[in-house]
């Protein structure tokens, strides 16, 4: 990997004022950007989405970058393309990328038991000490954590006050914030360097992501979004003073597009590392990813080979393998999907609890995506699916 290649995505996006007058959808249909803008505004208005930022990439170039609605509804402050938005679980693909960059540097190994990188026994760290009672903890590797198969729960608080494994490592998919946060802790502990500093060095600064951080920076105060519930009530701002591997990223859709372009163009990691990230590691066999249905056994997604790689989910479509990730937190809902064979991607970020209700429409109207398995992570079902 050569450093000067890292400038490619940035150079492309610096020209984002030259937006296309038409958007080409996955199936080849063309939609005028003026028409798309009107359609998206209608979806935002009727869906009561407080604020929405949309970036569409075709052939590794930004062809659409626009915002709708408000960053702060109570103050009637409009969202703009430089408004930073709390990105929640969008952090996870970035955490996975950052870790693989450190693997490329020879600092970490993907399949070495993670406890080897701790400077002290696990029971000496108050937040993680209960893992000492888990006989399978010594078997957990970074690969398992990044593919959500470590056996750690999504959040310990669903199971009590302490952290314990809920499955045998490598045997079952359980989406886990705890796992990603633990991996972030290990990186900081072993390297004696903060995650945000690593991200600045390896991702943000090389790609010119000036509106991004894994922690809250003072400059974000000038133009930031506030989270809102389904009724439009303010839920405040997510100010994270410390980085979390599972979800502390603050960014814009334009900045995140720079990251995705560089990642899928093999400009951030070695080809071997990217292949490992995108390769299906564990099949999704549950009807839902969250809530009581996460323990169900279902063949609902067998036909599309829905699976998780390292920090990124994948599924089959008529246009080849596609990749995706989302964010769901009170007041914040976001989603991105990438179609590498079509060189197409869309990033949607909102400060509203109402985004997911309109997600099917938004994906279909932006790039003609009617294939993403959104129902796995939300109770909103697709009314009609075009095949």
Regions found by a protein language model. Name each.
Residues 153-157, 211-222:
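Proline-centered turn/helix-capping motifs that create local helix->coil transitions or kinks
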Residues 1-26:
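Bacterial Sec-dependent N-terminal signal peptides
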Residues 70-184, 191-193, 197, 225-233:
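Active-site-proximal loop and beta-strand segments within enzyme catalytic domains
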Residues 59-61, 71-73, 150-151, 219, ...:
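Solvent-exposed coil/turn segments that connect beta secondary-structure elements
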Residues 48, 78-79, 109, 133-140, ...:
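Extracellular/periplasmic catalytic domains that process cell-envelope and extracellular macromolecules
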Residues 21-67, 171, 188, 193, ...:
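Catalytic loop of the DD-peptidase/beta-lactamase superfamily, centered on the K-T-G motif
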Residues 62, 147-155, 201, 205-209:
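Glycine-rich, acidic and aromatic/proline-enriched surface loops and short helix-turn segments
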